[in-house]
Amino acid sequence: MKTTHTKNLIAAALAAALAFTAVIARAADPLPSWNDTAPKKVIVAFVERVTKEGSPDFVPPAERIATFDNNGTLWAEQPMYFQFLFAMDRIKALAPQHPEWKTKEPFKSVLAGDMKGLLASGEKGLLEIMARTHAGMSTAEFDQIVREWFKTARHPRFKRPYNEMVYQPMLELLAYVRANGFKTFIVSGGGVEFMRAFAPDAYRIPPDQIVGSMGKLKYELRNGKPVLIKLPEVLFIDDKAGKPEGIQSFIGQRPIFAFGNSDGDQQMLEWTAAGRGARFMGLVHHTDAEREWAYDRKSDVGKLDKAWDEAVAKGWTVVSMKDDWATIFPPTK
């Protein structure tokens, strides 16, 4: 009897010890939502090389610049970029004041819920929607409208607030590189004012470290108070070749670490790779149709084609969501 009891105690103690060891190991792992595959190993090895004093690849903290695309890299982008879904909701809200929209594209497609028709309108149609829904209000008014939208809007598939559609592995990566002296920036084709309304809370990246597309602003006095009014004119598009241009214009330093997910990020990765010393270039490849989506070369949103070919040819890191991420989204709040 005593022998059986003793064995049970030993078994329980071993189980507790193993569980405790697992907890300690997880706590010590800076990237617990990443599987122990090649991309994770490459990332950790790179960070250790550039932060270890005496290493031939050591980079001073002031030069540890990391840039991240947003759509499809830090958060989801299907069935359409979330800022466009916001703009579509604004079109529907404003439609009673504009009966002409029922017969005029791209507004007709928006009101009919015709996603294919909207995409067929191309960049011109999407920019027109953005201009009509964003312009005329102050930056403070726009910020408030965006914040209110995030409180009520839900993703059609996952039924979660859009600002919860962020990738847990990338949240961990942001925290990891910051803990190692990196300064993290968003460099995205999304609207800078839209991103500034949610990104500081979602990613712990302050507004002054967010580079994005932007429209023109106009200074005015309204009711005796100075305001900045959003105009229906594009000032800068932070996509493709615009990304390295934006990095130089608004950051002033070439990154040593850059992550994207589509052909729109190709030039940012090329610009990063062209610098001297150790460099990391990464792409998120959407390969998990069950937990997220699977798309690449033929997608209307987040197309990954030429950048993928270049990544393979040059040995950049390509992260497969299905194979390399143990978790996609954070737990629901």
Q: Which sequence ranges carry the predicted segments?
A:
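Secretory-pathway/luminal and periplasmic proteins that interact with or process carbohydrate-rich
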Residues: L74-E77, G117, A197, D208
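Non-catalytic pre-domain segments flanking phosphatase-related domains
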Residues: L9-I10, L14, F20, I24-N70, ...
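N-terminal secretory signal peptides that target proteins for export/translocation
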Residues: M1-K7
